[in-house]
């Protein structure tokens, strides 16, 4: 977006902060800001702090649903609400900033297309990352209609060392360090380039930067302010000059649980991992091999979905044995037997949803200590200090589904709001969730 276009946008008197429970519920407020001309219709940057990428796609949703926003909102859920906005043409750049325990997508820059699959009319992507392949979302470029380009940057943020929490009172801030160093480094105002020490070729032949980010470790396995400074400079270079962006924070960025691990026994969870395991293609797979990989994966998931849907109606031994006779599904017998021994009526739909998270990597699970939460808060604060002010902020609590621990969510929410107030002054906070939605 040009500087002239950004100047034509309306400005909020105070920075709006929308706080919701389920993450996809932030979307109506982003669309409202587009409608009121506080955000542009296209080329919005989206900075996303989260333990989960949320970059999947509703598998069977017609692509044209994105052009009816009310229908769109009703189709989305917590893991798949960002990509439809990309296909609608609003987001062109997503920066996923994640903690060290979340490793679902490879680090670096991913440039790919998001469009309508000509054969199914659903939304699909050209990315060959395991995250998309394992959900059956890849198609070749020539199979897409109305493709939109997406620049996805995946960046690791580590907590700041405890002894540096009061660094601001003792010496230079990160922001000051960057300003002092700007004379020594040319900062390109382009969304396509990050100056870094090394780069590597991606599977699609594009050069991916190796980020000088906060994953640079110290002896205490936490980041220093110098590495945080490098990370901030990288993000500043990613954002085009004059670009407006939405700042999005899921509170499970600071502390996260895998709720399915508490629903099922260790043996049951292991069986789900076996049933839903994803066979990765080789690193240098040809397009035909990738297409075959996705087709096989889609058939695998469809068979499992059909099996558990059948169990909702009839989970007798005969039905289970019939499904277990299919290749790769023999462990269904042991799984259903174990579930029925513990539960009067197993929720087979929920079991399938749990299985879908057991493909190539487990859901992140790290219940943070107060010290770890504070270290991440300090790191987020130092990073945001260096960035332009966002147009609006969205916060997701993610506590009712137990991704952010319910006993910590209120504490984390207040701490995050305190950070935002310290950076941006008065806030226009909207609490869009039911009171008492956590146990804290």
From Swiss-Prot:
Residues 187-207 are annotated as: Disordered. Pfam families: UPF0489. Residues 188-200 have a biased composition (Low complexity). Signal peptide: none annotated. Transmembrane segments: none annotated. Belongs to the UPF0489 family. This is UPF0489 protein C5orf22 homolog.
């Amino acid at each position: 977006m040009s500087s002239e276009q950004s100047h034509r946008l309306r400005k909020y008197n105070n920075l709006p902060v929308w706080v919701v429970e389920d993450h996809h519920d932030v979307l109506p407020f982003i669309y409202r800001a587009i409608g009121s001309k506080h955000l542009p219709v296209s080329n919005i940057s989206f900075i996303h702090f989260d333990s989960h990428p949320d970059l999947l796609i509703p598998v069977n949703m017609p692509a044209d649903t994105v052009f009816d926003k009310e229908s769109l909102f009703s189709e989305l859920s917590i893991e798949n609400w960002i990509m439809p906005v990309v296909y609608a043409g609003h987001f062109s750049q997503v920066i996923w900033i994640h903690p060290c325990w979340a490793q679902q997508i490879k680090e670096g820059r991913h440039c790919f297309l998001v469009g309508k699959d000509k054969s199914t009319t659903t939304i699909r992507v050209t990315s060959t990352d395991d995250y998309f392949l394992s959900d059956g979302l890849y198609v070749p470029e020539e199979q897409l209609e109305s493709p939109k380009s997406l620049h996805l940057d995946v960046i690791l943020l580590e907590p700041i060392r405890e002894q540096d929490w009061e660094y601001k009172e003792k010496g230079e801030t990160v922001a000051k360090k960057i300003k002092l160093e700007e004379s020594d480094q040319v900062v390109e105002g382009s969304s396509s380039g990050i100056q870094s020490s090394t780069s590597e070729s991606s599977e699609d032949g594009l050069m991916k930067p190796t980020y000088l980010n906060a994953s640079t470790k110290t002896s205490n396995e936490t980041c220093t302010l110098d590495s945080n400074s490098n990370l901030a400079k990288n993000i500043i270079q990613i954002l085009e000059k004059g670009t407006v962006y939405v700042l999005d924070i899921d509170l499970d960025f600071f502390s996260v649980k895998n709720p399915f691990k508490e629903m099922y026994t260790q043996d049951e969870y292991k069986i789900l991992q076996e049933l839903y395991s994803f066979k990765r293609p080789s690193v240098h797979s040809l397009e035909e091999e990738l297409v075959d990989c996705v087709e096989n994966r889609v058939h695998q998931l469809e068979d499992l979905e059909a099996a558990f849907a059948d169990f909702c109606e009839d989970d007798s031994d005969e039905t289970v044995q019939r499904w277990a006779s299919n290749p790769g599904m023999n462990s269904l017998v042991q799984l259903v037997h174990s579930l029925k021994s513990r539960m009067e009526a197993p929720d087979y739909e929920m079991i399938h949803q749990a299985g879908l998270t057991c493909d190539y990597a487990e859901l992140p699970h790290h219940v943070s200590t107060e010290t770890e939460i504070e270290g991440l808060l300090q790191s987020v604060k130092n990073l945001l200090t260096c960035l332009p002010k966002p147009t609006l902020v969205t916060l997701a609590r993610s506590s009712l589904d137990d991704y952010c621990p319910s006993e910590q969510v209120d504490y984390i929410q207040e701490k995050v709001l305190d950070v935002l107030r310290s950076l941006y002054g008065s806030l226009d906070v909207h609490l869009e969730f039911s009171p008492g939605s956590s146990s804290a």
